[in-house]
Amino acid sequence: TRAAILFPQGSMANSPTQPVTDTTRGKFGPFDGQMLVGEMNRARIMRVLVDEVAGETQGACLPFIDNGGLHRGMHRFVFAPDGSLWVGQTHLSWAGGNGLQRITWTGKTPMSLSRMKLTRIGFLLTFTKPLAKVAAENFIFQRYYYKYHQGYGSPQLGREPVMVTALKLSDNGKSVSIDLAKLNPGYVYQLDLKNITAADKTPVLNTLICYTLNRLTNGNNTAPHLIAGSP
């Protein structure tokens, strides 16, 4: 079974830790119901955007909090009744740190990607705030894949840029539909947001998004490049 969501080694994470779902009903911010994942090697918490496509769970990951006073070694998470997130850190005789930290929502909505949905020919991106005017050069896509094998690890293979062929901003300004020149199963589609701001001039909080595409909307999940011995 292919991984539903891959965390690219190095750029996104090195050692992901406990996943925890935000069940605070808005007490922790605008991402209720989404999953957070820790990271041992750097001061980062990641957020997961689940996408159900033709009966299969796949989706994207992106940084949620980078640094911002966090310590490394985030290994355990629990939400308190007041909606705050307690983070336990350890080094386990390895990378990481020690500590116990509490994260609370400031009450201000950050400018960030809230949903990423696969479409027939690209992606539908939804943000927490209306976007300022956008163009194709604001959305830099590339794709790559990893060996699907029994051995430990894999380099990124088949890395190539993917051209944006069309985009359309929704009437409320929060969503943008993006068409891509290449859309195939078995790849991680990496999106780097360049100079994206909200209409109120708030800069986007995190700019790196990695979507694991296992299945297209028509149900096709054929990925011969993942099979051992294929070119």
PLM region descriptions:
Residues A181-Y187:
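Surface-exposed, short loops/turns at beta-strand junctions within beta-sandwich domains
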